[in-house]
Amino acid sequence: MEWVWALVVLAALGSAGAERDCRVSSFRVKENFDKARFSGTWYAMAKKDPEGLFLQDNIVAEFSVDEYGQMSATAKGRVRLLNNWDVCADMVGTFTDTEDPAKFKMKYWGVASFLQKGNDDHWIIDTDYDTYAVQYSCRLLNLDGTCADSYSFVFARDPNGFPPEVQRIVRRRQEELCLARQYRLISHNGYCDGKSDRNLL
């Protein structure tokens, strides 16, 4: 009879996974998000890609808050054009507050015209401000409230990544966003470091 109980347990686990609520409106964000503590340099460690041409790796973002409490960001990273031309490019974003301090509208554009531009939701799903942050954006909703075109970043303060206990937290947040195993790791090999004008846009 032990195998029967094993099947029951597996079925229950499978049912629990199948019943995960993937409607965007159900996703939890960081409570009492503090923009000032979040400001500074963040290194992208992993990314769930959207549709369109965005920065691909070596992504470093700098968030800042001005004297009026307005948050903005710049990001630099590598982009591959025409399948064989690597360039370093910059993107800029400005944030509009909403009723929830962890949910923003982000207007963004590339300094180079070939990069994607838009005005998307930008949610801070979780952060401890000192080690990690998980960001999420849904650009297009399905009729059932799930997301048809989303992107998400996992950021770190340290370009070398996270300790194991933080990795476990990040994985849980990815699962809660219904994006488990949909992220790709982002390399940091120094391609866009320095002031060289080689392949800069």
Curated annotation (Swiss-Prot):
Gene Ontology biological-process entries: retinol transport
Q: What name does the UniProt record give this protein? A: Retinol-binding protein 4
Residues that, per the record, bind substrate: Q116
Q: A cellular component term (GO) from this record? A: extracellular space
Chief location category: secreted
Keywords (A to Z) from UniProt: Disulfide bond, Methylation, Retinol-binding, Secreted, Signal, Transport, Vitamin A
What is the protein's quaternary organization? Answer: Interacts with TTR. Interaction with TTR prevents its loss by filtration through the kidney glomeruli. Interacts with STRA6.
Native organism is Equus caballus
What GO molecular functions are on record for this protein?
retinal binding; retinol binding; retinol transmembrane transporter activity
Family membership: Belongs to the calycin superfamily. Lipocalin family.
**PROSITE patterns reported in the protein's UniProt record:** LIPOCALIN
Q: InterPro entries, per this entry?
A: Calycin, Lipocalin_ApoD, Lipocalin_CS, Lipocln_cytosolic_FA-bd_dom, Retinol-bd/Purpurin
The residue range of the signal peptide is 1-18
General function of this protein: Retinol-binding protein that mediates retinol transport in blood plasma. Delivers retinol from the liver stores to the peripheral tissues. Transfers the bound all-trans retinol to STRA6, that then facilitates retinol transport across the cell membrane.
Show the disulfide pairing.
Answer: C22-C178, C88-C192, C138-C147
Coiled coil stretches, renumbered:
none
* One protein family per Pfam: Lipocalin
Source organism phylogeny: Eukaryota, Metazoa, Chordata, Craniata, Vertebrata
